[in-house]
Amino acid sequence: MSGVNNTSANDLSTTESNSNSVANAPSVKTEHNDSKNSLNLDATEPPIDLPQKPLSAYTTVAILCLMIAFGGFIFGWDTGTISGFVNLSDFIRRFGQKNDKGTYYLSKVRMGLIVSIFNIGCAIGGIVLSKVGDIYGRRIGLITVTAIYVVGILIQITSINKWYQYFIGRIISGLGVGGIAVLSPMLISEVAPKQIRGTLVQLYQLMCTMGIFLGYCTNYGTKNYHNATQWRVGLGLCFAWTTFMVSGMMFVPESPRYLIEVGKDEEAKRSLSKSNKVSVDDPALLAEYDTIKAGIELEKLAGNASWSELLSTKTKVFQRVLMGVMIQSLQQLTGDNYFFYYGTTIFKSVGLKDSFQTSIIIGVVNFFSSFIAVYTIERFGRRTCLLWGAASMLCCFAVFASVGVTKLWPQGSSHQDITSQGAGNCMIVFTMFFIFSFATTWAGGCYVIVSETFPLRVKSRGMAIATAANWMWGFLISFFTPFITGAINFYYGYVFLGCLVFAYFYVFFFVPETKGLTLEEVNTMWLEGVPAWKSASWVPPERRTADYDADAIDHDDRPIYKRFFSS
C-alpha cells in the first residue's frame, strides 16, 4: 500500500519551499489552500538532494543507533528474567508464602503484583522522566534514567526475604525503563537518516527480543542452583548492561533538533553530518538544517509547550496523541503476552515438561523474527506491516482458540487431560506463527510510528502518553490473565481475536504511512489532514509537480466500502 511518491527518500526541503509549506502555518485552515497553490507555482526550482549512498555507507550510523537501541535490551532482559524468577525455588522460598503442607508458593495476587507492577513504574517514568531529555538533551536523559534503573536493581538484589522490598525495587527500575522506552526511540528517530530511519528505530525492538531471549537462557543456566544464585546472577548482570549503555552514550551524536532548539547550531550541523555521512558544508545538509531550524523557530513563536497543548485539534496534536495511544494499546491487545503465558501449558501437551525450555523456544522465534522486521518496516512501510500483521495474527488466534476449545480441552478447564496430541501440535505451530507475525510487524512498528508522529515541541509528552498506554495495558493483561484463563481457558483467545479485527480497521482508517518522509514532512502531512488510506500517495509540498492534485489526496468523497478496497 506504500506509494512510489512517498518513498523518494533522498529529497530534502529547501529553505525557500519550506517557507511556503503548511508546516509553517500557525492556522492550517486559513493558509492550507494558499500554501498548496503557491507551492505548485514554486515547484520549478527542484529541491536539493542528499547524495545517494549505498547502505554500507551508513554502517557507522547503524552502530551508533544500535548503542542507543541497547536500552531495549535492558527492558527485554528484565522481561525475560522475571518470567523465570517467579518459578525458581529459592525465589519462591524467599518471597512466597507457606501453605498448609509447609511448602512455599507464590499466590496469584503476589505473583501478579511482582511481575506487573513494573509496568506501572514504566508508565510513570515515561511521563515524568522523559522531560529530562527536553531539558538536558536526549543523551543525558538516557544516562539519567539508566541510573534510576540501577537504583531499582540494587534494591531488588539486596532483598533477603521481604517481598515488598523486591516489589519497591521493581517499581523504581520500572521508572527507569519507562524513561528509556521513550527517549531511546526518540533519539534514534531524530539522528537517523530518513532513508533508513524505520530500520534503525526497529533496532530498539530487536534489542528487546535479544534481551528476552538471553534472559531466558540465563534462567535456564542457573535453575539448578539451590540458593540466591538462581536469581541474583540475572540481576547482577544488569550492572554490566547498564555500564555498556552509559558508555555507549559517550559516542552517539546528540539530536540535531534538540541542539538547534537550545541554540547550539554548529553542533547540530556536526550531528547531521555524522548521521548522513556528508561534510558539514554540504548544500543538502545545510538545506535540511535550515528546514529543521525554520520549523523549530516557528514552534518557539507559539511559546513554551504545555500538557494542555496535547488536546489541541487546530494543529492536529490531539489526533496524533489519540492515534499513538490507540496503536500502543492495540499492540498489547494483540495478545502476545497471552501466548507467552499459555505457551508452557500448550507445550506440555507434546511432552515438553520443562517450562524453561518452553521459554527458550519462544524466545528464539521471537528474536530471529525481529531481524526480518528490520528489513520489512522500511521495505513495505509502517502501515502495510501493521495491516498484514493484524490479519495474520487474527488467523492464528482463530485456529489456536478453536482447536483448544473443541479438540484439546473439549470439556473445559475442569478436565485438562489432553485428548488429542495432534491438537496440541497444531496449537504449537500456530503459536510460532503468531509470534513470528507479531515480531515482524506490531512489535516494533508501533514504536517507529509513534517516534515519527509528533512535532518537536510536544514530542516527549506525546510519546510518553502513548507509551504509558502500552504499559498500563501491559499491567492489566499480565495481572489479570492468570485469573481469566483459569475461568474461561482458551475462549480468552476470542477476546484478542476481536481486538485484532478492530486493530485492522483502525489502522486502515486512522494510521498514515510515514515511510520515506522527514519528521518535518510527517508534520506537514498531518496538518494537511491527509486521509490515512491515501497517505502513501501523498507528496511533500516542495516535491510536488504541476500535475499533482492535492485536493484529490486531501478529500475523498467515495463510499467507505470503496475506500477500504483501494490502495
From Swiss-Prot:
Amino acid composition bias (Low complexity), ranges on this chain: 17-28
Entry keyword set: Glycoprotein, Membrane, Repeat, Sugar transport, Transmembrane, Transmembrane helix, Transport
Keyword Transmembrane helix: yes
Topology relative to the membrane: Multi-pass membrane protein
GO CC term (a single one): plasma membrane
CDD domains, per the entry: MFS_HXT (cd17356)
Domain of life: Eukaryota
Residues in compartment: Extracellular: 78-112, 161-170, 219-232, 354-359, 406-429, 489
Cytoplasmic side: 1-56, 134-139, 192-197, 254-336, 378-384, 451-467, 511-567
Compartments it resides in: Membrane
Glycosylation sites: N87, N227
Leader peptide range in chain numbering: none
UniProt record, GO biological process: carbohydrate transport; hexose transmembrane transport
Family from the record: Belongs to the major facilitator superfamily. Sugar transporter (TC 2.A.1.1) family.
Name of this protein: Hexose transporter HXT9
